[in-house]
Amino acid sequence: MKRYSILLAVSMVFISALAADINIVFTGDILLDRGVRRAINRHGVDHLFSGGIDSIFRSAQVVVGNLECPATKIVSPVQKLFIFRAEPEWLGALKAHGITHLNLANNHSIDQGREGLMDTRRNIIAAGITPIGAGQNMDEASEPVLLASEPRNVWLVPSLRLALENYSYLTDKPCVSQEPMDSLLNRVHRLRKADSTAVIIVSLHWGGEHTLRPISRQRWDAHQLIRAGADALICHHTHTLQTIEDFHGKKIYYSIGNFIFDPTRPLNSQTCMVRLKVSETGLETETIPVEIRNCVPTIVDHF
């Protein structure tokens, strides 16, 4: 009996060690307006989540999406070409399907002005989701977000790398994270020095829309961020699946494309999710191919 008790104890320790690993999933752009709004009006928000997506989300402790529109009742559009707005009550369905964090460091979060941005942030919190990359000022907006603390800290550092249309860059007003690159590099470097065993993920909203490859300056900046201490870059904005690079053993996803979206071309329908498995000593990265069909992201076997 004593021998069996010892074996059971050893087995439980082994199971606990396995359970200590954490899965974190990243998705591309989530648009809840335009064609997606029409789909929601016809079928409801739940229709946007296929069984395969739900299964992936259920396997994760953290799911991070890029919300490509303000979710607010405030209608105060800025003067720009594409202006979006989602209904805040739709955020509850995102939470119900497993999304835990929403990135706002993009070029559409400000579509309904500063008040719309901060109202979106409040609405995300009210839905039980953590907002990323927006705040009362640039310092707050640029703060790294702790995604997980077990089995070790996992930090996400967000940043918009694009100029905003007809929107003043004011660091002391409500805004999205948009600090200069040298400041971003210093932030990652300081975080690495302060938390040497952490996993640091950088999420950039950048690149040329509808292109398949990053430009040389993007590659340079991405490499500098890895050298500064980032463990991976998982980026978006181009509405396409771009180059996936391995640099010094670290993954760089220059753009993972759309997620919940209304693409009109096959180029914009091919996308991916990224799943990170974090253990006490390792980081595994998995690319999950996705195809968008009638606004609904669907798991596929290959690109």
Residue ranges and their predicted role:
Residues A19-F303:
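Acidic, metal/ion-coordinating pockets
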Residues Y4-I15:
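Sec-dependent N-terminal signal peptides
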